[in-house]
Amino acid sequence: LILFTIRIPDHAILILSKDKKKFKPKLIIIEIKNQNVSGSVDEKLWAGIAIKKNYQYWLENFDIEYVFILSTYLYNLVIGNKKKYNGLSKLLSDSNIKIFYGNDINHFENIYNLIINNSK
C-alpha cells in the first residue's frame, strides 16, 4: 500500500473476505503509545482522529479500524478526570477509535478478539 510510504503504523492487519459483496477489505491500524511522565506523546492521542481520517481518505476502498494500545500512564490519562483530557475519551469513542490497556492481563486475547470479530 502506497500510504505506508507516508505513514508507518506500529502494526497493520489486513482482513479480506472471500465474499467481496459481503464487505470491503478491512485494515486494522494498531498504534502502541508509551509514556510514563508528562510529555508530548499524549498529543498523538488527540491526533489519532485526524490520522484515522487520513487513512480513510487515502484508502477509500477499505474499512479502516484504528486502535491505540496505551501504557499505564497514558491509559490513566484517557480514563481519568484531568481537565485537559476530559473530552479525549469521548472524542476517540465518537471516532470509533478503540483503546486497549497494554498491561491488561488479557491484552493479547483482546487483540485476537478484535481481529476475529472483524473477520466475520
Model-assigned labels for residue ranges:
Residues T5-I6, I32, S38-E43, N54-W58, ...:
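Catalytic phosphate/metal-binding cores of nucleic-acid and nucleotide-processing enzymes, i.e., regions
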Residues F23-I28, N34-V78:
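Catalytic cores of nucleic-acid endonucleases
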Residues L1-F23:
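Active-site metal-binding core of divalent-cation-utilizing nuclease and nuclease-like domains
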Residues D63-K120:
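Domain-level recognition of nuclease-like catalytic cores that cleave nucleotide substrates
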Residues K18-K26, K33, K44, K52-K53, ...:
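Context-gated lysine
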